[in-house]
């Protein structure tokens, strides 16, 4: 089966936005106008094609990025819907990794929200060219031009409108296309499927000319030949303008900006045209860099059908009918279903049973996948998110993804013995799907602990346990993932000796324990010279310390950010063993920690609260009571914005408190920022509770 769509006519794009900017509705309309869905799915009534997990339908928020393929003007668009809630940033981050371009959707009233900034930063990190779609132009308070200035100020980007609105709020009729200099007006009877091209209304001619001039200048700046033409007073043709915008969009020096109302079916076709005209094909983005697993040297992987297969697994889902689906973006070469691939990250061979092309919840079997395509692989056993799949003759590892450590834990107790078995299977499946979710066992109580990026994240996981896996479980109080660290450097000697007839135990070490910068982790340095401790026992000392650091001396929390230097010691020809040195290492570490001025650390969350001015005082007072430190206060769209760092331990149940304090008018977002030291009076309480 030959390739149906040439590589230059493929667009892998994501739709990213803040909650409620209308992202899923926009995706739905794209599917409707490209002829995939027959009935428009509304998020308001929980039937959107893209939102296909039960909880998404119920909460009306998008959790997992579903991928769908659709066609527009003979171009194939692979659409990836990404979640907009802070607790799911990992999902967004994964999708960004495999996108070639993105549409950032902003609400014409809410403008640039904190979550939009996070998503924007992630798109910058992966160098994803993007365009902006200002949605909900029919809402009361809609203001396209204010969103334009917010994008400049808050995101430090350069938005260039390529169409501007005709009217706003209930008078929003259509857009003025600044490239063609025509008005496009949608008629409501045909659900927005038909539109008329008219002359620009007289009252908007001046505004249109002003923005047309800005557009011409921005397009001309991208290319020398265009600049000469523009400065020489020559008219730029439509092709010239499009060429300039595309160059600027690809190198991210400008962001094409459009407007519309997805819910009212206006502006979606012009958005699709812009996707095809300005966002990159897989061949137009920078080459992907990879690593040669044999010698760790850097390789570049170019997008083409020639060459050995290479692809990246970016999402895993469990499907009740097919089992595990692994979503893969192919970067190079082609692959047939039924063939073998190498998982170069794990060094294991995998067989691809079937290849499925996904429509957000329907699927079609395909024979082979080509470069630039995205599809689901069925039958992979060991592959997890972020692994590279490639031809075993030409191994390559595409970028590794880094996943954040969980900041919150809760205990889950299965209700019956049968639930116990189902739960362990379910949790391991969920952990495969979501690398920012961890499962562990509490050492003392034997309880199962689940950890994640926030309360909502874990709520949804518990919900999925009940619905998808039919596990009845009791959920404990949320526990904060505290850590311990040390503040002063100390030296410590420890001799572990048991010699009372027969084979004894003997291990003797001198270690130096030093604090390191926050977030730099653990480091072990071997400074033994002259063989005072034989080489084979040194890893045992390291292992002993690594085991001991899981339970700190203050309250049994993991110890982080320190350096150990092993610099002296002694051994016994007969009695020394790995075990003895492991015990000596762990005892030395514990003793050293007691003298090294150990402190407790807690996760500090970056909190942004948005409230009407009259509640400002109460909100700040409340954040101070929660041991928050206020960083800044701003105004946005007539509301006050408070930025603060607040300990996670003090933020439980905040949404309810904020709602009652502001009569439901305040909103907030929070994401993990860093670990900070716990004040001594609070630390004392925590330690007493732990020792209980």
Swiss-Prot record:
Localization in the cell: Cytoplasm
GO cellular component: cytoplasm
Positions bound to GTP: 17-24, 81-85, 135-138
UniProt keyword annotations, A-Z: Cytoplasm, Elongation factor, GTP-binding, Nucleotide-binding, Protein biosynthesis
InterPro entries: EFG_II (IPR041095), EFG_III (IPR009022), EFG_III/V (IPR035647), EFG_IV (IPR047872), EFG_V (IPR035649), EFG_V-like (IPR000640), EFTu-like_2 (IPR004161), G_TR_CS (IPR031157)
Annotated function: Catalyzes the GTP-dependent ribosomal translocation step during translation elongation. During this step, the ribosome changes from the pre-translocational (PRE) to the post-translocational (POST) state as the newly formed A-site-bound peptidyl-tRNA and P-site-bound deacylated tRNA move to the P and E sites, respectively. Catalyzes the coordinated movement of the two tRNA molecules, the mRNA and conformational changes in the ribosome.
The family this protein is said to belong to: Belongs to the TRAFAC class translation factor GTPase superfamily. Classic translation factor GTPase family. EF-G/EF-2 subfamily.
Record protein name field: Elongation factor G
Organism annotation: Helicobacter hepaticus (strain ATCC 51449 / 3B1)
